[in-house]
């Protein structure tokens, strides 16, 4: 079992629903530790930079507009197989297709307002974590 880190974002829709604590409980209940966290209002430039990989996709503008529509909570999760564990907790991108009991099935409204973001691979996680958290702001526990 590998100890990994992954980036997690609680998106504006879930922050507005006041389910941050419930989502954090799921992370911790699955054995994931929160080793860095902050609440922020993303600027357009931050959101465009973070999602630059999708810049040519038709949904890019709507995604950026959504991500800057309200505050988000950005955290780094650490634990055994953290990336896949976090993705399992999140559920499918489309909440209608997400398994019952996943974060998206329970808290998301649509494929766009889908409550959470999570890194999809180890290399992606490293890049995403570095984007929001300089190394000196992440603390192993």
From Swiss-Prot:
Q: Which UniProt keywords apply?
A: ATP-binding, Cytoplasm, Kinase, Magnesium, Metal-binding, Nucleotide metabolism, Nucleotide-binding, Phosphoprotein, Transferase
- What does it catalyze? a 2'-deoxyribonucleoside 5'-diphosphate + ATP = a 2'-deoxyribonucleoside 5'-triphosphate + ADP; a ribonucleoside 5'-diphosphate + ATP = a ribonucleoside 5'-triphosphate + ADP
InterPro entries in the record: NDK-like_dom (IPR034907), NDK-like_dom_sf (IPR036850), Nucleoside_diP_kinase (IPR001564), Nucleoside_diP_kinase_AS (IPR023005)
Enzyme Commission (EC) number: 2.7.4.6
Positions contributing to ATP binding: 11, 59, 87, 93, 104, 114
Entry GO CC: cytoplasm
Q: What does the record give as cofactor?
A: Mg(2+)
What is its subcellular localisation? Answer: Cytoplasm
Q: Name one GO biological process term.
A: UTP biosynthetic process
Where do the catalytic residues lie?
117
Molecular functions (GO terms): ATP binding; metal ion binding; nucleoside diphosphate kinase activity
Question: What sort of enzyme, by top EC class, is this?
Answer: transferase
Q: What HAMAP family does UniProt report for this protein, alphabetically?
A: NDP_kinase
Q: How does it assemble?
A: Homotetramer.
Family membership, please give it.
Belongs to the NDK family.
What's its job? Major role in the synthesis of nucleoside triphosphates other than ATP. The ATP gamma phosphate is transferred to the NDP beta phosphate via a ping-pong mechanism, using a phosphorylated active-site intermediate.
Protein known as:
Nucleoside diphosphate kinase
Organism, by scientific name, is Janthinobacterium sp. (strain Marseille) (Minibacterium massiliensis)
């Amino acid at each position: 079992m590998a100890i990994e880190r992954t980036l997690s974002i609680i998106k504006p829709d879930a922050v507005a629903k006041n389910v941050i604590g419930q989502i954090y409980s799921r992370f911790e209940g699955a054995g994931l530790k929160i080793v860095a966290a902050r609440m922020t209002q993303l600027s357009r430039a931050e959101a465009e930079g973070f999602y630059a990989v999708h810049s040519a996709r038709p949904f890019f503008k709507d995604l950026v507009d959504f991500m800057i529509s309200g505050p988000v909570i950005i955290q780094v999760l650490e634990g055994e197989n953290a990336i896949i564990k976090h993705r399992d907790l999140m559920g499918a991108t489309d909440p209608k297709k997400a398994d019952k009991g996943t974060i998206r099935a329970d808290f998301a409204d649509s494929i766009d307002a889908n409550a959470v973001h999570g890194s999809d691979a180890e290399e992606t996680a490293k890049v995403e974590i570095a984007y929001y958290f300089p190394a000196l702001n992440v603390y192993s526990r």
